[in-house]
């Protein structure tokens, strides 16, 4: 039993030198553990490096394509970009213009809104103030109340314009330097604004307690008497009737304004100067409106210049008979000449 085992062990122990290291490793290391520290660290990261490289190449290709596309768009859309910039500028200018117009409209509405309180009045109040403008009140110790609105005076001025137009058309007035409407509007508004400003200046010098708005309202309502007088006398052409209404109606409206100014002025000299100037201007303006646009003007011109006679007018005259023997032929000639003249005039 021991003899056959010897060769096996001898064979094993007598192995060649090429198997010596292997046997030493098997005999010396009884464990199959692999030392990971001695492994190459770069052996497992080769796939990751390839992925990063591929991704980098793709990004570079995308960037190159984008740059090329931008260059092509810049070359192709050069004129289109200029047009787009021009359209934006035009749109901006239109927006600015619309904004300016809107601001102007808003400012205009704001200005109209400022004037609204001066025209906010009821028709009943206007009617009562028209009647009060014809009734003078004697009250000197306290200032009389003056309406601070412009609706009634403005309507009276326009009414006076319409009456003047009616008077111009009925009297066949010829205005060479302007139209009838322009002349009437200029006359009425010029008197209202001009005289109001002048009297306000005198009131300031005379230390009267009245404002420009009150002066406009006072003189505007004072034109109510002028409207009544002119409306009646333009349709009824009687001088006596005009002078009667001029003294009564025009005088009442003037006395009303004078009473208001007297109550607001201190000192007899100042009162005389201010009230006398206003009364003279108001009454003379009514005379001017009557005689400037009435048929009386034509009668005055005819009286001063004489009747209209044609420059050359042929009148048949008798031929004097010098000798008694020639009386018969001369009588025949005169009769013939008269007959011819009558025949020519009939044709």
From Swiss-Prot:
GO terms for cellular component: Golgi apparatus; plasma membrane; transport vesicle. Its main location: membrane. It is found in: Cell membrane; Golgi apparatus, cis-Golgi network membrane; Cytoplasm. Expressed by splenocytes (at protein level). Residues 1-31 are annotated as: Disordered. Residues 167-184, 235-237, 293-347 are lumenal. Residues 2-145, 206-211, 261-271 are cytoplasmic. The modification N-acetylalanine is found at residue 2. It is a multi-pass membrane protein. GO terms for biological process: cell differentiation. Glycans are attached at residue 334. Belongs to the YIP1 family. Interacts with YIPF4 and YIPF5. Involved in the maintenance of the Golgi structure. May play a role in hematopoiesis. This is Protein YIPF3.
């Amino acid at each position: 039993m021991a003899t056959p085992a010897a060769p096996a062990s001898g064979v094993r122990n007598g192995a060649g030198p090429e198997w010596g290291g292997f046997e030493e490793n098997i005999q010396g290391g009884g464990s199959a553990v692999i030392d990971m520290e001695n492994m190459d660290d770069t052996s497992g990261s080769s796939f990751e490096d390839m992925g990063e490289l591929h991704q980098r190449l793709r990004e570079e290709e995308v960037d190159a394509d984008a740059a090329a596309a931008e260059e092509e768009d810049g070359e192709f859309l050069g004129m289109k970009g200029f047009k787009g910039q021009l359209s934006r500028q035009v749109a901006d200018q239109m927006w600015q213009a619309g904004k300016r117009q809107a601001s102007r409209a808003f400012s205009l509405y704001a200005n109209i809104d400022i004037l609204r309180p001066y025209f906010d009045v009821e028709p009943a109040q206007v009617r009562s103030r028209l009647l009060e403008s014809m009734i003078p009140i004697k009250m000197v110790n306290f200032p009389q109340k003056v309406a601070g609105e412009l609706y009634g005076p403005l309507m009276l001025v326009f009414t006076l314009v319409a009456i003047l137009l009616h008077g111009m058309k009925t009297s066949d007035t010829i205005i060479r330097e302007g139209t009838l409407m322009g002349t009437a509007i200029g006359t009425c508004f010029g008197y209202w604004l001009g005289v109001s400003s002048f009297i306000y200046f005198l009131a300031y010098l005379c230390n009267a307690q009245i404002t420009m708005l009150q002066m406009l309202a006072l003189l505007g309502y004072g034109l109510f008497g002028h409207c009544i007088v002119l409306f009646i006398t333009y349709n009824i052409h009687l001088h006596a009737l005009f002078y009667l209404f001029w003294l009564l109606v025009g005088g009442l409206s003037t006395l009303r304004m004078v009473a208001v100014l007297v109550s607001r002025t201190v000192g007899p000299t100042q009162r005389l100067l201010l009230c006398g100037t206003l009364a003279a201007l108001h009454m003379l303006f009514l005379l001017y409106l009557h005689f400037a646009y009435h048929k009386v003007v034509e009668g005055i011109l005819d009286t001063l210049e004489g009747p209209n006679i044609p420059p050359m007018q042929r009148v048949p005259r008798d031929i004097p008979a010098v000798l008694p023997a020639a009386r018969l032929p001369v009588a025949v000639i005169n009769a013939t000449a008269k007959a011819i003249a009558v025949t020519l005039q009939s044709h």
